[in-house]
C-alpha cells in the first residue's frame, strides 16, 4: 500500500513539473511574439533593421576555449 502511494505521488509530481515547464515555454513564446509585433513608427529604418537582426540572433554563450587561444 505504501508503495502505491509513493508511485501515485511521484506521478502527480511529474505531471505538475511537466505542466509547469509547458506553461513557462508558452509564456516565453508569447513574449517572443510580442517583441516581433512591436510598433516601430517614427523610428529610423536602420535602427529597426539592427533591432530585428539582434532579436533574430541566438543568445550568446560563454566559451572558455576562446580565452585559451588568445593568451599567446
UniProtKB/Swiss-Prot annotation:
Main location: secreted
Keyword terms, alphabetized: Antibiotic, Antimicrobial, Bradykinin receptor impairing toxin, Fungicide, G-protein coupled receptor impairing toxin, Hypotensive agent, Phosphoprotein, Secreted, Signal, Toxin
Propeptide: 25-35, 61-72
Compartment(s): Secreted
Tissue expression from the record: Expressed by the venom gland.
GO cellular component: extracellular region
Temperature sensitivity of activity: Partially and reversibly loses its structure as temperature increases.
Biotechnology: This peptide encapsulated in chitosan nanoparticles shows an improvement of antifungal effects on growth inhibition, viability, and biofilm formation in vitro.
Protein function: Potentiates the hypotensive action of bradykinin (BK) in normotensive rats, and induces a vasorelaxant effect in mesenteric artery rings that is induced by endothelium-dependent release of nitric oxide (NO). Does not inhibit angiotensin converting enzyme (ACE). Shows neither hemolytic activity nor cytotoxicity to normal and cancer cells. Shows moderate antimicrobial activity against the fungi Candida albicans and the filamentous fungus Trichophyton rubrum, as well as against the bacteria C.albicans (MIC=128 ug/mL), C.tropicalis (MIC=128 ug/mL) and Aspergillus flavus (MIC=128 ug/mL).
Stated family: Belongs to the non-disulfide-bridged peptide (NDBP) superfamily.
Protein name: Hypotensin
Organism: Tityus stigmurus (Brazilian scorpion)
